[in-house]
Each structure stands twice: as C-alpha cells, then as structure tokens.
Amino acid sequence: MIDSGHLRLHDTVAGAVRDFVPLRAGHVSIYLCGATVQGQPHIGHVRSGVAFDILRRWLMARGYDVAFIRNVTDIDDKILNKAAAAGRPWWEWAATHERAFTAAYDALDVLPPSAEPRATGHITQMIELIELLIETGHAYTGGSDVYFDVLSYPDYGQLSGHKMDYIHQGEGVTTGKRDQRDFTLWKGAKSGEPSWPTPWGRGRPGWHLECSAMARAYLGSEFDIHCGGMDLVFPHHENEIAQSRAVGDGFARYWLHNGWVTMGGEKMSKSLGNVLSIPAVLQRVRPAELRYYLGSAHYRSMLEFSEAALQDAVKAYVGVENFLTRVRTRVGAVGTGELTPRFAAALDDDLAVPIALAEVHHARVEGNRALDIGDHEGALTNAGAIRAMMGILGCDPLDERWESRDETSAALAAVDVLVAAELESRQMAREQRNWVLADQIRDRLKDAGIEVTDTVNGPQWELLAGDKQVDAR
C-alpha cells in the first residue's frame, strides 16, 4: 500500500480537480465505456483503455479494492450496417471484432475488467429501466419507439454545459418525438434487424440506455467513477446522467474523460479515414513501447500521433530498459523497490503521468551515474524505484509479461488475431463472389504492411518487414 498524499481527479461536471473520496472506504467502483465492436481496434480506441488502466493500477497500489466494469456495445446501427455490407450475421460480426479488441487490450497488458458485460446480455435490465422512466413521467412512447423527455429533467446539460435551446441529439428528425431534443431509449423493430419483445412491441435498445442499465446492474444505483473518451461527453454521457438520475439513482460521483489521439489535428476516426490500426503499429514497435507511448501524455490532453513522436517514446523506453539490463548484468537481480515521493505526488495530482515519467528518467540518469562510479547500492536503489514506477504505468521492462517473450512474439500474437478477423471477412466475400470487397480487404492489409497469399491450404500472411510467416486461422 502506497503512503502518499490525497488523490485529486479532474471531474468533468465540476470542471475542476477535486479531492477523491470513495463512496465506501477502501473500495472504488469504476465504469468505463468500452468499445462498440463495429471494426478493428485502432490506437485511438486503446488509448482510453491504457489511460484508465493506469488509474486502476494506481488505486490498487494505494490499497483500494477496485471493481472495474468495461462494457461491450454489441448491438448498434454501425454494427448492423457493416455486417450487412459484408454479408455476415450481425452477431458474428460483433463477436469477431470483440475478440480483436480483447487481443489488443491483452497485447498492451491492460488488466482484464472485473466484468465485461455485453449489451445484448442485459435487455431485461434495460426494459426495467425504461418502465421506471415511463412510470415517473420521464419517458413516453412514440409510435413503436420510446423516448426520454429531456424537458422533464431540469438539470439536463450539467455535464456538457449545453444549453437547452441548442441541444441537438444527432438522431435526425424523428416523427414520434414530442420534442426533437428528446433522445431514443428504445427503437422499434425494423425488417431484417434483431429485436426483443417488450411491453411496447419488439425492438432494440438505444445506445445511451445500455450503459445506464449495465452500470446499475454491476455497480448499483450509485458508484464512484465513470470514464470514457471526451467525445462521449455529449450526447452519450449527458443522456446517461439524465436517464439514471431521473429514476433517483445517484449514478457516477466523478466523471473522467480522456483526450483523443489525433493525426494532423483531426480526431482519429474510421469515418475520417485516418485510423492507425494496432497491427500496423505493432509491426514497427513492441507492445510495451506502444503502451509507453499511449500512456506518456496526460490523459486529458490530445495525443498528436507522428512517427517521430512514436520513435521518441521508443527511445525513452529503451533507455530505461537498457539501464535495468545493465544493472542486472553488472550487479545482480533487480527487485521492485519503493516509489519516489515525487512520482507518487505526480499521480496523486490528477494522474500527471508526464511528471511521473520525468521522475523515472531522473532515476535512470542517477542510476547510470552510480553504476559508472561503482556505487552498486545506489544503482540498485534507483533500478528498484524505476521498476516500481514503471510497474504502476504498466510497462516495467523486467516484468515477466514483457521479458517472457522475444522482441516480436507478443506483437505477432496480437497481429495474428486481428488479421484473422480481416481474412475471415475476405473469405466470406470470396464465397459470395464479391471480388471487389475481397480485393479491398487484401489491399487494406497490404497498406498496413501485411502480404496475403492464397494457397491450397487457405490464405497465409506475412509481415513485409519481417521474415516470419504465420498460417492464417
């Protein structure tokens, strides 16, 4: 247990850093909005996972018992549309890409969540929440849909700061709404789409409803921290607050939001075509190096991707790794030591990772100096502190997680899972004689540095920059 000062976190509702006081002493409950499993994960997706994994590790180091819930949105318009375009069942499409996200998180040593609920597994809880909202006058039916009445909740806008006169839900004009500022809780069934029976007819859940219902199911009516990307502040998180507090739930007491990964000043997004997939990056750097890069900026700041910045992070990580290896070779085994007070103070100050990393590199410089003058005790002390600090950040170079693999095996394991999903889509397209789509998938893989060869034993792939070939699954 870390004996440090008081943890302070930036709460989006307050617009300021606040002292963190958990609902129950010794326990922290966290809900992180996970992936909508519509496609392959890119580094913008996993930045959120890494950022709040550091928060979780720091809370655990401070002695807290942490319940960490990360959901999976496995039913959504985008999933249905992309699965239909690929000629695949929606549930298969979602499951394939859920596995890809799991592989990406695992490759970067993001700790598994305490629970990872899927939206489709919690339809009953969603229906119960809608019934409560209707009973309390906060929701109404409109045609085959159910909507939340925004005007019925006076505090609407408290998270995002949006004024009622300027609210736009992004749902388009819907005839069943009493007010176009209202948002959808339940979508009436459409031909060919999955649906579930309800008192209002068959249909499927709205996006915002899913998270409120699952957070309630796993963490109760009130919990400590809700996390997610800053792009979710409005409308997603604003609507979560409204529908949960409208039925009397306290819901989240702190709201934390991470910044985007950007390219050329634009948010990394599939719709903009500027995404950088996990396989493409892991072809060039090791998983520990990518994790170091994604976690090195303050979680609330934008992370502008560039090859130069990525290589700077690799160089910094390798510098730490080389120092620890030097000490182990010249002095002996390096155990995990004590965190420095400045490192602890940095993380207590709203997870100021850049300042914490400055302390890591200060210890590296001091440790190298001690090693050079034969001060083995000083070298070991600094090396032990570095292992402790890098462990909190999830990328201790001497941790068996990273040491047990050679330089490329971890990357190849992750790439294998991710590429297999793409090849599965390509094979489906070929079977349907959709040669255009099949060629597009092949070309997309080639752009990421992966060469696909069709053989009598099925497709095989290899990294263009390497010499190891792996049979496709």
UniProtKB/Swiss-Prot annotation:
Q: Name one GO biological process term.
A: cysteinyl-tRNA aminoacylation
InterPro entries membership: Cys-tRNA-ligase, Cys-tRNA-synt_Ia_DALR, Cys-tRNA/MSH_ligase, Rossmann-like_a/b/a_fold, tRNA-synt_1_cat_dom, tRNAsynth_Ia_anticodon-bd
Q: What is this protein called?
A: Cysteine--tRNA ligase
Query: Would I find Repeat among this entry's keywords?
Result: no
Q: Which cofactor does it need?
A: Zn(2+)
- Broad class of where this protein is predominantly found: cytoplasm
Q: What reaction does this enzyme carry out catalytically?
A: tRNA(Cys) + L-cysteine + ATP = L-cysteinyl-tRNA(Cys) + AMP + diphosphate
Which Cys-Cys disulphide bridges does the record give? none
Q: Record-annotated residues binding ATP?
A: 270
How it assembles, according to the record, is: Monomer.
* Keywords noted in UniProt: Aminoacyl-tRNA synthetase, ATP-binding, Cytoplasm, Ligase, Metal-binding, Nucleotide-binding, Protein biosynthesis, Zinc
Query: What EC number(s) does the entry state?
Result: 6.1.1.16
Q: Which gene holds the coding sequence for this protein?
A: cysS
What the entry lists under HAMAP family is as follows: Cys_tRNA_synth
Record the organism: Mycobacterium leprae (strain TN)
Free-text cofactor note: Binds 1 zinc ion per subunit.
An example of a GO molecular function for this protein is:
zinc ion binding
Q: Where, by residue number, is the motif 'HIGH' region? A: 35-45
One GO location term (cellular component): cytosol
Catalytic EC class: ligase
Residues the entry annotates as binding Zn(2+): 33, 211, 236, 240
Where, per UniProt, does this protein localize?
Answer: Cytoplasm
- Recorded family membership: Belongs to the class-I aminoacyl-tRNA synthetase family.
UniProt key word Ligase? yes
Residue numbers covered by motif 'KMSKS' region: 267-271
CDD domains for this protein: CysRS_core (cd00672)
